[in-house]
Amino acid sequence: MNDCDLIVVGGGPAGTTLATLVKKHAPGRRVILLEKAPGPRHHIGESLLPGLVPVLKEMGVFEKIDGAGFPRKLGANYVWGRDRAVWENDFNDVNIKEMLARHGKIPEKIEYAWQVRRSEYDEILLRHAQSTGVEVRRGAVATGILEDGERVAGVVLAGGEELRGEFLADCSGQNGFLSRFRRIREYNPQLKNVAGYAYFKGAPWKYRFSGHPDKTKIFVCSVACGWFWYIPIAADEVSVGLVTSVEFL
């Protein structure tokens, strides 16, 4: 006998988005979301794209995100390849003819996204999911899977509790919950990269590279060993990281 209709492993944006939308479109279904962290947790992946705006609106959480005080992101600037000139990309540069040809209509114009502190952003999404009726279990660590033939029927939690569901969604991100237990995880050797990052305060705002405190851009710069990111996440704080190969380190 199932304990619920859907078990979601992982309380990041993927898990909260899925859980929220399932409850919206099937309010009678019981959805249990398992998040291993007992409270808000640090994470990278701080520069968002405008393509998620329609999703946030469908979830009913757009106003909460837009009103949270995150710096608005208007685009991206790059220094990439042999030509070291700055390549500017603005979200509001819309090619009307191209959009008409591709979609047959002009979709909603979205001019910005946000640069976010993930502990705050993810917490807003998690609390919103809970407010829609999703059963959120914090500090719930899934340590194994329950199998019914070839079917994954549920999870085993730390402490031995078994939880069964009609469906199981692995939204654990890099943790790769299901792929580890099913031993089906494979790495692309060309993408075996690592990232080192830190946060800096007091860095000058450079409009050419990032913008100004309420209207920013991510700045991406290629270097011989990989590439750097420069993401303004607050009025006086930037996230700076280097992505490079394992061999370089």
Residue spans of the language-model regions?
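Extreme N-terminal starter segment of soluble prokaryotic enzymes
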Residues: 2-6
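N-terminal Rossmann-fold NAD(P) dinucleotide-binding loop
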Residues: 15-16
